[in-house]
Amino acid sequence: MQKYYDVMIIEFSVKNYRSIRDLQTISFKATGLKSPAGSEIDSNNIVKSDGVSLLKTVGLYGANASGKSNMLMALSYFAHAVRTLAIDSRGVRPLYDPFLFETSNEGCFFQIVLLLNGKKYRYGFVVNKSDNVPGKNSSNDVKIESEWLYGNVDKNMKRLFLRVGNEVKENNLPTSEGMIIPTKLPYPHTLFLVHAAAFDAKGIPEQIVSYLKYRIIGNIVYKEIFRGVSINIIKTCWRN
């Protein structure tokens, strides 16, 4: 399991999902805005790591039906998909819910940017309906249309893998000594990130999967856990 200070989320982006048609991003980057003089908000809510200033908490504001809840739903299901076994498409299926008036057959886009051990990583994928759907609610009714991972290598952003359809076109993942990650994917809905993590317990994919698995608790998928964690945090803050 990753320590809290080892991994931090920088931003999360969504496109063509439920009420969200155009690309929308939740950013945890601190801006140059300052709180009133004497306020402790900045010092208590901003954490700095490797020269990057990030917010511990953010708020979403907007009109009714503007997509606030759907952004959180997307993040919750995104993390849930990474937690799910490669054989099961149920983790990916809730992420295929394109904008109602989208007629181009474009897939649903999701991407997260993380700071992992001082290095920035950008991971994402596009979910679309399967080309051959045997029946309603079939386990094969969705597929990963594309998937990618970029990371800082020698201070430059490098593509670590690229998957198009069910084929891994490029694999530059650094692995532990003696580890070989097969690029053949068992199912169209299998995430290569999860697939790679299963073969290298110390690699970058496993570290990303661990963060999404243990550190992002969505109030959509895990309502009771989210409620319990929230109550404990409030109680702790109240005592202090």
Tell where the protein language model's regions lie, with residue ranges:
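Pre-Walker A-like glycine/lysine-rich segment at the N-terminus of P-loop NTPase domains
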Residues: 2-77
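Conserved P-loop NTP-binding catalytic core
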Residues: 5, 44-59, 63, 72-132
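A short, compositionally biased
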Residues: 7-8, 105-109, 139-145
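Short acidic, glycine-rich loop/turn motifs
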Residues: 14, 112-118, 149-153
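Short loop/turn segments at secondary-structure transitions that flank enzyme active sites
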Residues: 18-20, 32, 84, 131, ...
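Short acidic/polar mixed-charge low-complexity motifs
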Residues: 20-22, 117-121, 155-157
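Electropositive, glycine-dotted interaction segments
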Residues: 122-240
